Amino acid sequence: QDAAKGEAVFKQCMTCHRADKNMVGPALGGVVGRKAGTAAGFTYSPLNHNSGEAGLVWTQENIIAYLPDPNAYLKKFLTDKGQADKATGSTKMTFKLANDQQRKDVAAYLATLK
């Protein structure tokens, strides 16, 4: 995992995200270690909020697994927690990052943001 390369890949994410302020997507400073759906001042989709309520905390590993298909990841998380009834709707995040190495690099970069 290479945070410097991840910073370059993150430029694609800046259409919707910044480290220090909410935009279309939530601020990502401090995302690693934060409960899903809890960035201050951001209104999340029920799917994302429910995932946080069910115990999803963002780790580098979770971010790597989330990025290829955010909706599928959150729905599987809730279903695995026995909360399939709350695994409805969709997240606001439509971008998907398919490349495995880029996902690892972005997760490493996000871990540096405070």
UniProtKB/Swiss-Prot annotation:
UniProt lineage: Bacteria, Pseudomonadati, Pseudomonadota, Alphaproteobacteria, Hyphomicrobiales
Disulfides per UniProt: none
Family: Belongs to the cytochrome c family.
Entry keyword Iron: yes
Residues that, per the record, bind heme c: 13, 16-17, 93
GO BP term, example: photosynthesis
GO MF term (any one): heme binding
Gene responsible for this protein: cycA
Origin species: Rhodopseudomonas palustris
SUPFAM superfamilies for the chain: Cytochrome c
Keywords, alphabetical: Electron transport, Heme, Iron, Metal-binding, Photosynthesis, Pyrrolidone carboxylic acid, Transport
Domain of life: Bacteria
Modified residues annotated as Pyrrolidone carboxylic acid in this record: 1
Record's comment on post-translational modification: Binds 1 heme c group covalently per subunit.
Task performed by this protein: Cytochrome c2 is found mainly in purple, non-sulfur, photosynthetic bacteria where it functions as the electron donor to the oxidized bacteriochlorophyll in the photophosphorylation pathway. However, it may also have a role in the respiratory chain and is found in some non-photosynthetic bacteria.
Cross-referenced PROSITE patterns: CYTC (PS51007)
Designated name of the protein: Cytochrome c2
